[in-house]
Amino acid sequence: IDLFNNNSKRISVSGVQIKYSLVADDGILRLTKEGEQGEFILKPVPNNLRNKEFCPANEHLTMQIAAQVYGIPTAPNGLWFFQDGTPAYFVRRFDLSEKGKLQKEDFASLAGLTRKNGGSDYKYDNLAYEEFARIIDKYSSVPQVDKLRFFELILFNFVYSNGDAHLKNFSLLEEKKGRFRLSPAYDLLNTHLH
């Protein structure tokens, strides 16, 4: 765990929680090297939450319930335990293919919101769900299907108390030849516990 903490500035990916970029090397996950594209994101136990030791299991369980019980497409994920038994959550990046990185745009970007024009809490901007639907109508190659998937995801977030369902936790993902679809769900967890 010290290796991760000592390298957090070099390999951390965006977001509030500390995250690390990993790659599979002969079947073993390791930190990415400078300039190397990571295949996985690892999220260790956060420092700033109530019941923080349960956060990795909470996210993994919530993602599994979404996928296995409700049929919501989710990013492949799992739990990883350090040698001292400390858990971490990891997720396979879904914006990579054999041909390289796929374009992924979160809803904050698609709505034109940034820290500069929306302030420090821009991703929590109170856009109505109707505005999310307009974004899907404008950019999705199959808007009716994606709006239904989005509605199901909103209901899931409500039922499972995911209070972190902000603009940057919904994305459209490039498929083929510039066609975009609602991405698999990610960052699903019961925030009421934390």
Model segments located where?
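Conserved kinase catalytic-core segment
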Residues: 54-70, 125-193
